[in-house]
Curated annotation (Swiss-Prot):
Gene designation per UniProt: AIP
Record-linked PROSITE patterns: FKBP_PPIASE (PS50059), TPR (PS50005), TPR_REGION (PS50293)
Residues the record lists as Phosphoserine modifications: 43
Protein name according to UniProt: AH receptor-interacting protein
Placement of TPR repeats on the sequence: 179-212, 231-264, 265-298
Species whose genome carries this gene: Bos taurus (Bovine)
Domain PPIase FKBP-type: 54-146
Subcellular location: Cytoplasm
A Pfam cross-reference name: PPIase_AIP
Function: May play a positive role in AHR-mediated (aromatic hydrocarbon receptor) signaling, possibly by influencing its receptivity for ligand and/or its nuclear targeting.
Length: 330
């Protein structure tokens, strides 16, 4: 350990072990997944906390060898064992890009696009003093770089092949191979009643395919082939959202499918159910009529949905009449 700390010091990184880890130091070959909590502090007298993964409720997952935009994190986690807690003070040369990385991580934590605001700017332009990152603390750090302190707790180290990668960490080939596996896992979770988890799997599979599709010319044979793989996954995702009663999301996704494939029976049926749930009676009836036109064998199922819709409408009418009687009786 002493020689590791000495090498880090020569490179402008001071390491202080707070709690020893378990077992031997992993070899951290390319593809190893390191899961850790981090806290980032300024190194000035105030020592302000910039970011804390515990506050956000989700640890950082770093894949070794994937050229993460902040190479110093890969350097320091390579020196840690599972269960270890350590503090690293890193010279400014190692953390110049931290403001950009932190913005992306904050966007991810907030459920936003991690590339928001970065698509049309090169790295140099982003570092210009007049380019705001949308966070006052990151803007200040960008304009006046300083050494940063990282408190790291290494939670878990997983060797390549022992975990399922997140879509963003996969190569194109890995994404293509992963989609059928993720799809089947989503189906299994749905059958077992784990609807929210199934939706997350379908979402991941769609994300893989969308990423591949972005690299193809829209309307080209490869683009169409990928789109036809996306459609059944999106319909499965919509089924999960129907169960979760998130009807407007179902309306949006099914409409997007029908704008491209106007003979998709499942999209009409799911959209009809969503319309019925939000009291769009005429639109629901129109969609169910289209289902019967395209697939007469669906008649028993459609009839059941229409009867349920009519019963709900009658009940609502009776409730409205009772409410109005109450208003006018005073």
């Amino acid at each position: 350990m002493a020689d590791i700390i000495a090498r880090l010091r020569e490179d402008g990184i001071q390491k202080r072990v707070i709690q020893e880890g378990r077992g031997a130091l992993p070899d951290f070959q390319d593809g190893t997944k390191a899961t850790f909590h981090y806290r980032t502090l300024c190194s000035d007298e105030e020592g302000a906390v910039l970011d804390d993964s515990r506050v956000r409720g989700k640890p950082m997952e770093l894949i070794i060898g994937k050229k993460f935009k902040l190479p110093v994190w890969e350097t320091i986690v390579r020196t840690m064992r599972e269960g270890e807690i350590a503090q690293f003070c890193c010279d400014x040369k190692h953390v110049v890009l931290y403001p950009l990385v932190a913005k992306s991580l904050r966007n991810i934590a907030a459920g936003k696009d991690p590339l928001e605001g970065q698509r049309h700017c090169c790295g140099i332009a982003q570092m210009h003093x007049h380019s705001s990152l949308g966070h006052a603390d990151l803007d200040a750090l960008q304009q006046n770089p300083q050494p940063l302190i990282f408190d790291i707790e290494m939670l878990k180290v997983e060797n390549p092949g022992t975990y399922q990668q997140d879509p963003w960490a996969m190569t194109d080939e890995e994404k293509a191979k992963a989609v059928p596996v993720i799809h089947q896992e989503g189906n299994r979770l749905y059958r077992e009643g784990h609807v929210k988890e199934a939706a997350a799997k379908y979402y991941d599979a769609i994300a893989c395919l969308k990423n591949l599709q972005m690299k193809e010319q829209p309307g080209s044979p490869d683009w169409i082939q990928l789109d036809q793989q996306i459609t059944p996954l999106l319909l499965n995702y919509c089924q999960c959202k129907l169960v979760a009663e998130e009807y407007y999301e179902v309306l949006d996704h099914c409409s997007s499918i029908l704008n491209k494939y106007d003979d998709n029976v499942k999209a009409y049926f799911k959209r009809g159910k969503a319309h019925a749930a939000v009291w769009n009676a005429q639109q629901a009836q129109d969609d169910f009529a289209k289902v019967l036109q395209l697939d007469p064998a669906m008649a028993p199922v459609v009839s059941r949905e229409l009867r349920a819709l009519e019963a709900r409408i009658r009940q609502k009418d009776e409730e409205d009449k009772a409410r109005f009687r109450g208003i006018f009786s005073h």
